[in-house]
Curated annotation (Swiss-Prot):
CDD domains linked to this entry: HATPase_Hsp90-like
Name recorded for this polypeptide: Chaperone protein HtpG
Primary location group: cytoplasm
Region feature B, mapped onto this chain: 327-543
Region (C): 544-623
Annotated source species: Paramagnetospirillum magneticum (strain ATCC 700264 / AMB-1) (Magnetospirillum magneticum)
Disulfide cysteine pairs (residue numbers): none
Top-level taxonomy: Bacteria, Pseudomonadati, Pseudomonadota, Alphaproteobacteria, Rhodospirillales
Record keywords, A-Z: ATP-binding, Chaperone, Cytoplasm, Nucleotide-binding, Stress response
Role summary: Molecular chaperone. Has ATPase activity.
Region (A): 1-326
Top-rank taxon: Bacteria
UniProt subcellular location: Cytoplasm
Length: 623
């Protein structure tokens, strides 16, 4: 087969340009990335060989070799892992297969420290080789296949793939170093890099320097099997970088050994930065499962619930069989008990952190709060534990609050925890539905995450207090006393008979466009607002479902009018005096459209809305 010449995917070309010219301020990281990839390759073959031992072909001692050649100016990183086929070389090295590539490129800031973390999250550490190499050659043969392949590129837009004679199983990555990068041929320098970044790799990393004997230069023991007292914070951090493919600092580290009926070791990390794929629809978790130090899978859905998918790390079981299949894991009682133990530990760690006076928990909440809240809806058994970990914005100041603190601040006569949902915090604060609550000093939780709509309706109560939306018709503040000195609202209302006549006229004009028209107890400044009938889905939830084509159609809502507002009083007086002309009908539609706009909805008929606005302005300005 002749040599094939191919172009890099466009996004890869942009990435390579960033990597080579501006991204990494610490070039030695390339070696960590290549060793980490080699380790993953060996782990995957070790697992595959449990059921297909012939894949090993008599070579079962996994290792990673570093071979510097000062005369040729090359550094070669060799592993005897699973290797890559022809198509895998093209797919893995010529494209970024992970979703969200465009978002990744859009989020590059030019700040090396921030951008390097994005590189790691996308699993493209291989391209870091071009920081120090003017040409990269990958020679690889996949385990179980007879033919090997060679991939070559200078990182400038294209690469070639050709057959490779006598290729060994695994991969050999040869870097033709750039001028000025020869420090990476020095044995002492290579040893120090491996010691710093890759000492935790459980597979031996060896160095063959010229005519000297080959030597192992890492500890080659699984970090999680060591005692905590033997592990430094720096070693924990570097292991996190390896297992999470991340460059940020771990926000929290949890290392423990469970003993008893079920034995396992967990080394878990909570990142400090939000991964780009945290809201990907597959909600994949990222904790690697080992059985007696043999890698099994990094895609075990049963290991942790989706609402803890931000956790990174490893779990090593002593009780699962080595030949366990992914299908067997789905209903395995041992794994179920491990999952229960892990969730309890993680939630316990979060509880401890949330009680820390230093305020670092707010950093965690900003990154992962929306994900953790999924557990309120999905994990009914632990809903109270998770609710107590939650933090919320509210009308009580600018900071975050707990539900316990909210309940402690409830007013005399207040029998519910009041909420309002929406997309934007600033817009929620301006919602007319809040006016009556503010007037009586009643705090309202401001919920802006999509999951909020679901857990509030599912949980219903906390500390024997129901959750109630201020945008629903059932919100009743009649039992809550107004602050001393507050004006008597009833004294300033439109006369009851005039108001009744106006309401009937508005109902007649709007017809089925509204479910009802009512005088409002919640409005103090605005003329109108829309509310959902008791038991109906909120307007915000309906809007979300419509955006995903999951709502049957727009529902008619209740239009509340403020009997104390000058406009409403004026309209009421006009109707009582016999004014039922087209001007009143226009006013009714404008009131409804105003209420819709406040809710972030467009007028039902924009052209008619514009015509009515012009008509009203003409009468007001021109007489």
């Amino acid at each position: 087969m002749a040599e094939e010449k191919r172009q890099f995917q466009a996004e890869v070309g942009k990435l390579l340009d960033i990597v080579v010219h501006s991204l990494y301020s610490n070039k030695e990281i390339f070696l960590r990335e290549l060793i980490s990839n080699a380790s993953d390759s060996c782990d995957r073959l070790r697992y595959g060989a449990i059921t297909e031992p012939d894949l090993l072909d008599g070579d079962s001692e996994f290792r990673i070799r570093l071979v510097p050649d000062k005369d040729a100016g090359t550094l070669t990183i060799i592993d005897n892992g699973q290797g890559m086929s022809h198509d895998e070389l093209i797919a893995n090295l010529g494209t970024i297969a992970k979703s969200g590539t465009s978002e990744f490129l859009a989020r590059l800031t030019g700040d090396a420290k921030k951008d390097v973390s994005l590189i790691g999250q996308f699993g493209v550490g291989f391209y870091s080789a071009f920081m120090v190499a003017e040409e990269v050659t990958v020679t690889s043969r996949k385990a179980g296949e007879a033919k090997g392949w060679k991939w070559v590129s200078d990182g400038k837009g294209e690469f070639t793939v050709s057959p490779a004679e006598d290729a060994a199983r695994g991969a050999a990555i040869t870097l033709k170093l750039r001028e000025g990068e020869t420090e990476f041929l020095d044995a002492f320098r290579l040893k120090s890099i491996v010691k710093r970044y890759s000492d935790h790799i459980a597979i031996p990393v060896t160095l063959k320097d010229a005519d000297k004997d080959e030597e192992t230069i890492n500890s080659a023991s699984a970090l999680w099997t060591r005692s905590k007292s033997e592990i430094t914070p720096e070693q924990y951090k570097e292991f996190y970088h390896h297992v999470a493919h991340a460059f940020d600092e771990p926000w929290s580290t949890l290392h423990y050994k469970a003993e008893g009926a079920i034995e396992y070791t967990g080394l878990l990390f909570i990142p400090s930065s939000k991964p780009l794929d945290i809201f990907h629809p597959d909600r994949k978790q990222h904790v690697k499962l080992y059985v007696r130090r043999v890698f099994i899978t990094d895609d075990c859905e049963e290991l942790l619930p989706p609402y803890l998918r931000f956790v990174r790390g490893v779990v090593d079981s002593q009780d699962l069989p080595l030949n366990v299949s992914r299908e067997m894991l789905q209903h395995n009682p041992v794994l179920s008990k491990i999952r229960t133990g892990l969730v309890k530990r993680i939630l316990g760690e979060l509880k401890k952190k949330s009680e820390d006076a230093e305020g670092k928990y707010d950093e965690f909440w900003a990154a992962f709060g929306p994900v953790l809240k999924e557990g309120i809806y999905e994990d009914f058994e632990r809903k109270t534990d998770i609710l107590e970990l939650c933090r919320f914005r509210s009308t009580h100041g600018d900071g975050l609050t707990t539900l316990a603190d909210y309940v402690a601040r409830m007013k005399d006569g207040q029998d519910a925890i009041y909420t309002i949902t929406g997309d934007d915090l600033d817009q929620l604060k301006k919602s007319p539905q809040l006016e009556g609550f503010a007037a009586k000093g009643v705090e309202v939780l401001l919920l802006t995450d999509p999951i909020d709509e679901f857990w509030v309706s599912a949980v219903r109560s906390y500390a024997e207090k129901d959750f109630r939306s201020v945008a629903a018709a059932g919100a009743d503040l009649s039992k809550v006393k107004a602050p001393e000195g507050a004006e008597d609202k009833k004294a300033d209302e439109a006369p009851a008979d005039e108001l009744t006549t106006l309401i009937e006229a508005v109902k007649l004009a709007l017809g089925e466009r509204v479910k009802d028209v009512r005088p409002s107890e919640r409005l103090t400044e605005s003329a109108v607002c829309l509310v959902a009938a008791e038991g109906e889905m909120s307007m915000h939830l309906e809007k979300m479902l419509r955006a995903h084509n999951q709502a049957p159609g727009e529902r008619a809502r209740i239009l509340e009018i403020n009997p104390r507002h000058a406009l409403i009083k004026g309209l009421a007086a006009r109707v009582k005096a016999g004014g039922t002309d087209a001007g009143l009908e226009d006013a009714a539609f404008l009131l409804l459209d105003q209420a819709r706009i406040i809710e972030g909805e467009p007028p039902a008929d924009p052209a008619a809305f514009a015509r009515r606005m012009v008509s009203v302005m003409e009468k007001g300005l021109l007489g």
